[in-house]
């Protein structure tokens, strides 16, 4: 690479660029739909017939929005700001576009229903239609007016001073008018000028923003908007391929209709909850419920903090300022010696970042007070000092509040888990606060509950098992038998950075706080951390909330069941205690023991649901419990199989292993073909599985293999005892009838020699190479009777048969595959409220079923939520 070549884009930069494309595509879809509701699709008199059939007025408004976006950086950071900008553009078009191009008349219009004494209130009507904030919309219109003045050298006039047909019966008090902006004589030149300006100032030169508007392939279809789109992720590098993001902009929620409206008695149409409506609905909640709260802790919360062993009010408020400044830095990278650009996560616009910090802090104080009130009602809590002085607890709650705010605005430049990295946390840390957050914020919209549920699933299935997760710091205490493996692969998390470290990292100075490091600020370990704690003092234990939505822990030992039953009494403060600290209500057990039991219970619940769904899809429901039991035993006794891996990889292997020992007609290919239909499927789960080992020099090396190789080399040796137990327990009828002393599961001995297979074919004239099909008789000879039932043979493919030419091409493509990364992402299907409640906690505090096996019950049709 030459010195002038730009550095290769990181995965984070690519992810942000992909998300930007999806955001703009969704914004353009909203704009086209709104424009077509307000204006006719007729082309102007001077507009030539084009292949795109995009009216020039629509194109002019789109370029005006793009120019506004370039001038105001906050417009490209989240979907809510984009919608406010586009609604401002629509207001300007309504003022300037000739009235004959409207689809409505002012009298009795359903589009403009807000009235004043002077006529229709245009801004209030648009805010009502599109759930926007009048204050934000006014700010956007002011920015748009300034942009028009600078671009076209025009002076804004008060609309009340202008006499034009467009403004008839409209209240013009708060509106501005530009003479000549869309007049016939100069409109074409104005359109060309602003389009040229947008192209020349486009810092994302790879993207054709006009194509995003004009190409229908860029516009996500409403029918496809059925899955989660909190992060607006894309399954492939859209900013490079310019592919349609239709299948990747997903929303997991559809608002069902009620049979009859109680007000008018008419049937109500089903409302499709798109990313736009979802974002505007949650933004309305944030604006009306959270933003109206006081900036500082309430008097009740201040009383609770001051009543501790020492007054913690200053420490709490100082921490909020520092952590939120680290998450939403207002200093650009240029100020720190870096460079600005689209993908710079530290280039937050000051006004935008300050608004997000204010929202997150208010939400944090609100939930913190609710948690404190609930803890005081716990019979085991008579002092809030341990909880309110716990650094990790506060950071997790702050990070969760910030993530909810970002999810509300559909932000693309700061995505999960970037919030955790900025706060010095790991995903396992966040998993301990999610349920408490949802339980104690009763007004949280359903969309945000589903967002947090999807985060919890991501953490459980893979993120918590990644290298550097604080899970291993608890696991090494709770399961000493895996300590050597954890240390061998260097899986332990680093110490949590202190607040001073965050200040130094961001080079920030909080107004009103001392510029010098404060001795009160937390260091890497918490104030109540045990000095014998491992490398990273991960302070977690059982939460009283978790009990209500978890299945009973696996009954591998009696004391685990007893512990789980009495865990309802565990105070939240023990959840964040150091792993080596004794559980205050658990006798001789450590906090790490209870923490791992809780986490494993969540894993088992998620696995039970996925095993049931997969077995039902394959139509082997009778094997569901066996697969689950094998998975449960592996999680308990072969926990190292999960290190650096995805739980679906173990589920697939368990299913195939059970099928082998039970002699079912089920191949890996069939399992994978059905797994690909699952909502959470992504190709790298079965194409790239981590295997770590040391070479002859003792150097740790890692390689990634497909699932069949992993199954044969790693899974079978570790899981064989559990699979053998299925045979010994009589899983097959013929096993019970076997009286010959033969190894169960082995083929019957035959008195005749095996018949030869077909004559092999010579495949090369110059080489003595012959190829013949792999027959069952050959397979029987290659594998011993005791092991034949466990292994997968090479003849079993992971892809469905197509044709010889296509299969050979696919083989060559895989042989030439140089990278591990598979362009895909997790998409979470819509889940029922019962599943969400089971994972996040019942709103009324009730408990759910305590048996994970309950997930095996046959699926029944779920009625839509009303």
Curated annotation (Swiss-Prot):
Keywords: Cell cycle, Nucleus, Repressor, Transcription, Transcription regulation. This is Retinoblastoma-related protein 2. GO terms for cellular component: chromatin; nucleus; transcription regulator complex. Residues 476-593 are annotated as: Spacer. Residues 841-850 have a biased composition (Polar residues). It comes from the Eukaryota. Signal peptide: none annotated. Residues 274-721 are annotated as: Pocket. Residues 274-475 are annotated as: Domain A. It is found in: Nucleus. Regulator of biological processes that recruits a histone deacetylase to control gene transcription. May play a role in the entry into mitosis, negatively regulating the cell proliferation. Formation of stable complexes with geminiviridae replication-associated proteins may create a cellular environment which favors viral DNA replication. Gene3D superfamilies: Cyclin-like (1.10.472.10). Ubiquitous. InterPro entries: Cyclin-like_sf (IPR036915), RB_A (IPR002720), RB_B (IPR002719), RB_fam (IPR028309), RB_N (IPR024599). PANTHER family: RETINOBLASTOMA-ASSOCIATED PROTEIN RB -RELATED (PTHR13742), RETINOBLASTOMA-RELATED PROTEIN 2 (PTHR13742:SF22). One of its GO terms (molecular function) is RNA polymerase II transcription regulatory region sequence-specific DNA binding. The gene is RBR2. Residues 594-721 are annotated as: Domain B.
